[in-house]
């Protein structure tokens, strides 16, 4: 069982989530340095997240669809609460509370808008060579 204090912190709206809920549109919160190209249709997230660390955790922003993208690292998406729908390599996948999915390097995917009570946790793993 998740600690109520932690759950309340995760459910609290961030300023970006407030904007996305109000505007019903995706707002980019990553700098251009996080991508290897300016192409919106084929954005690739780079190792931007891994400054002095090999694993990066974050709560996925709610209320707007996250555009199609891919990575130069592995990603696990874990549904802590509610539901998340992703389009992975052209196929729609529904994840429910407790589900997780491992996304390989270069896997194209997008995430449909999460609702008020949906919590998706992103766990990113840097590839060390």
Predicted feature locations:
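Generic protein-terminus/edge-of-domain signal
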Residues: 1-80
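N-terminal regulatory/effector-sensing and dimerization cores
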Residues: 50-129
């Amino acid at each position: 069982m998740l600690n109520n204090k932690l759950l309340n912190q995760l459910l609290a709206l961030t300023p970006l989530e407030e904007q996305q809920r109000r505007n019903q549109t995706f707002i980019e919160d990553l700098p251009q340095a996080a991508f290897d190209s300016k192409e919106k249709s084929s954005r690739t997230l780079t190792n931007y997240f891994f400054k002095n660390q090999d694993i990066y955790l974050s709560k996925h922003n709610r209320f707007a669809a996250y555009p199609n993208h891919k990575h130069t690292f592995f990603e696990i998406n874990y549904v802590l609460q509610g539901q998340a729908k992703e389009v992975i390599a052209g196929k729609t996948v529904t994840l429910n509370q407790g589900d997780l999915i491992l996304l390989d390097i270069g896997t194209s995917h997008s995430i449909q808008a999460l609702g008020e009570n949906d919590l998706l946790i992103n766990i990113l793993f840097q590839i060390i060579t």
